[in-house]
Amino acid sequence: MSYKNVKNLTDDFTTLGHIAWLWANSPLHKEWSISLFTKNILPAIQHDQYILLMRDEFPVAFCSWANLTLTNEVKYVRDVTSLTFEDWNSGERKWLIDWIAPFGDNNTLYRYMRKKFPNEVFRAIRVYPGSTEAKIIHVQGGQINKFTAKKLIQQYQEELIQVLNNHKKIVRG
């Protein structure tokens, strides 16, 4: 059994409170369940795979990400609630899990992420409030070569589509 330093645990609970407040103020997230909140937020905090932007000691934006294997990526695309704690840091394929900026700080968070991950490519499942449809979007770091980013995005997309199509063939049998 392992124990966390009390200060860090206190910091984690403070962080959790800040994120909960942002979640409650997001037109999209405030309609989601507390079980989804814990499934999306606790692993991000525990793996230190999040950004929480503060202004004047006030939380204004939050972003979390998971590093997935292709297998876990397929699982996530099929069911965004499927990730386990272990899945969050299982591979090199970066996915934005949550992006919350309910007070107009979306561009600030975007610039921060591009600077923090200058040579990375992220994907995200974008859901719009009131919609039952989603789409996969791409976000790239501020210094990655556009050709390299495009090539990587295309590779990831082709691999994902191939696995999804193979699964359909198996299911249809």
UniProtKB/Swiss-Prot annotation:
It catalyses: a fatty acyl-[ACP] + L-lysyl-[protein] = N(6)-(fatty acyl)-L-lysyl-[protein] + holo-[ACP] + H(+). Pfam families: HlyC. Keywords: Acyltransferase, Cytolysis, Cytoplasm, Transferase. The keyword Cell wall biogenesis/degradation does not apply. Its main location: cytoplasm. One of its GO terms (cellular component) is cytoplasm. The active site is at residues 29, 98. Its EC number is 2.3.1.-. InterPro entries: RTX_toxin-activating_protC_bac (IPR003996). One of its GO terms (molecular function) is acyltransferase activity. It is an enzyme of class 2 (transferase). It is found in: Cytoplasm. Belongs to the RTX toxin acyltransferase family. Protein-lysine acyltransferase that catalyzes fatty acylation of the protoxin, thereby converting it to the active toxin. Homodimer. This is RTX-III toxin-activating lysine-acyltransferase ApxIIC. It comes from Actinobacillus pleuropneumoniae (Haemophilus pleuropneumoniae). The lineage of its organism: Bacteria, Pseudomonadati, Pseudomonadota, Gammaproteobacteria, Pasteurellales.
